[in-house]
């Protein structure tokens, strides 16, 4: 492999798709051979020379390992940079992109471990994707909510409620001041609550809360299903009800289904909330798998208006700088290379709409100052137990979250330092909000 696929003098083309792999070779295997093997197995190579190699322009189509750098503080571990010609990939297909780059190479015998840390998607390839159904600005215009983070709540217990009781919980949360409530990722259409019943009772709750508060409300109706045809049926029913947003579990549902659903949502005026169920199976290991920043980039290309991104401060894992790195990759139009935040390549999104990061998992009102400071306005903060665990009930829990959020936003706008004064801001708000 090394003679053909390791090319340290290669000049990267503007149209190349670039990958950064964290690579741990087996003992005794040279890093150059491993890097070349990764490039070969994820592009044109196989385990031996075949006569049909002579029938193609190998130099035009092969992947190239063009740089290797040792990982500081680790023994026998390298970052391998691989460049892939754009012609290797089908236009507008995240499925084909991932099948090529990570589909086969991770089981390679010469490697102890392999992790895809980052991808550079060139403008020429970015422009073949539709991206999010609507994007951040269109969502704010449709909801008529500006200048603050959006607030949500996952209805608990996640399984076992009847549709009517579920709808009641949705209504209480929305009436109290939240913008959204959410189906949990494993709420689909079980025997205790069929999807059509849930959609109807949740729509009733949304319209009742809207009429009482004068604000646009939404509930992430999970359209994920066992078949794409059934998923379309659920999305179509949501559109008929006139609700603003539906939801999809994009990793368990698959990228092909997700891209199809995103196109349906764009055509039918639905926002699309994306849950990342199963992500930790892929991204939690430090040395093997795919980093979540890659999953976030590919989701933005496939299509999603919201994506769960970790909290930095709650019950789930997430390092602050690294989390902020992929949050920027979800939201911003142009992101510079910054290795301190785990961003290996400069990424130009060419005007593609942004995806709102969703902070969810073990957060409550005392986290509000930190969340406001870390995520800024273009985020959705979701408090499940932090709303429903209020001793007075769901609606007072929602009131407490809304009051805390608006107090933190006002304090920030007045120039106060939320990292130092956050506790004082919440205590001051408590004086005039008994729910908080």
UniProtKB/Swiss-Prot annotation:
The EC designation for this entry is 4.1.1.39
Pfam families, per database record: RuBisCO_large, RuBisCO_large_N
For the keyword Metal-binding, the answer is yes
Q: Which residues bind substrate?
A: 104, 154, 158, 276, 308, 360
GO-annotated cellular components:
chloroplast
Residue ranges of the TM segments: none
Task: List this protein's GO terms for biological process.
Answer: photorespiration; reductive pentose-phosphate cycle
Cofactor(s) recorded in Swiss-Prot or TrEMBL = Mg(2+)
Site described as Transition state stabilizer, located at 315
CDD domains recorded = RuBisCO_large_I
Name the principal localization, coarsely classed: plastid
The Swiss-Prot or TrEMBL record annotates one GO molecular function as:
ribulose-bisphosphate carboxylase activity
**What the protein does?**
RuBisCO catalyzes two reactions: the carboxylation of D-ribulose 1,5-bisphosphate, the primary event in carbon dioxide fixation, as well as the oxidative fragmentation of the pentose substrate in the photorespiration process. Both reactions occur simultaneously and in competition at the same active site.
Task: Quote the HAMAP family the UniProt record gives.
Answer: RuBisCO_L_type1 (MF_01338)
Give the family per the record.
Answer: Belongs to the RuBisCO large chain family. Type I subfamily.
What binding partners and quaternary form does the record give? Heterohexadecamer of 8 large chains and 8 small chains.
Name of the protein: Ribulose bisphosphate carboxylase large chain
């Amino acid at each position: 492999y090394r003679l053909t696929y390791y090319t340290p003098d290669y000049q990267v083309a503007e149209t190349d798709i670039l990958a950064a792999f964290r690579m741990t070779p087996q003992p005794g295997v040279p890093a150059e051979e491993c890097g070349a093997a990764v490039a070969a197995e994820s592009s044109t190579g196989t385990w031996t020379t075949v006569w049909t190699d002579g029938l193609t322009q190998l130099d035009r189509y092969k992947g190239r390992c063009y740089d290797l750098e040792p990982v500081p503080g680790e023994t026998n571990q390298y970052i391998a940079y691989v460049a892939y010609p754009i012609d290797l990939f089908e236009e507008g297909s995240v499925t084909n992109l991932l099948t090529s780059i990570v589909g086969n190479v991770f089981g390679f015998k010469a490697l102890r471990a392999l992790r895809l840390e980052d991808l550079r998607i060139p403008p020429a390839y970015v422009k073949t994707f539709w991206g999010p159904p609507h994007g951040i600005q269109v969502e704010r215009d449709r909801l008529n909510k500006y200048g603050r983070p959006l607030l949500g709540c996952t209805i608990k217990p996640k399984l076992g409620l009847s549709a009517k009781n579920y709808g009641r919980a949705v209504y209480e949360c929305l009436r109290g001041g939240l913008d959204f409530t959410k189906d949990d990722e494993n709420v689909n259409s079980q025997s205790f609550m069929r999807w059509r019943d849930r959609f109807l009772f949740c729509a009733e709750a949304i319209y009742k809360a809207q009429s009482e508060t004068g604000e646009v409300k939404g509930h992430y109706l999970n359209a994920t299903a066992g078949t794409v045809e059934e998923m379309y049926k659920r999305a179509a029913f949501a559109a008929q009800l006139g609700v603003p947003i539906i939801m999809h579990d994009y990793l368990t549902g698959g990228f092909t289904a997700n891209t199809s659903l995103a196109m349906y949502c764009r055509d039918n005026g639905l926002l699309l909330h994306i849950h990342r169920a199963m992500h930790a199976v892929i991204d939690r290991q430090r040395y093997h798998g795919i980093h979540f920043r890659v999953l976030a980039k590919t989701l933005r290309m496939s299509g999603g208006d919201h994506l769960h991104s970790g909290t930095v401060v709650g019950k789930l894992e997430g390092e602050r700088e690294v989390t902020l790195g992929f949050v920027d990759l979800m939201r911003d139009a142009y992101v510079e290379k910054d290795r301190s935040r785990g961003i290996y390549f400069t990424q130009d999104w060419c005007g593609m709409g942004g995806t709102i990061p969703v902070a969810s998992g073990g957060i409550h009102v005392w986290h509000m100052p930190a969340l406001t400071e870390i995520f800024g306005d273009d985020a959705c903060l979701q408090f499940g137990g932090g709303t429903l665990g209020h001793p007075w009930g769901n609606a007072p829990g929602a009131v407490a979250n809304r009051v805390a959020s608006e107090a933190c936003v006002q304090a920030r706008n007045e120039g106060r330092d939320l990292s130092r004064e956050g506790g004082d801001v919440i205590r001051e708000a408590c004086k005039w909000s008994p729910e908080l």
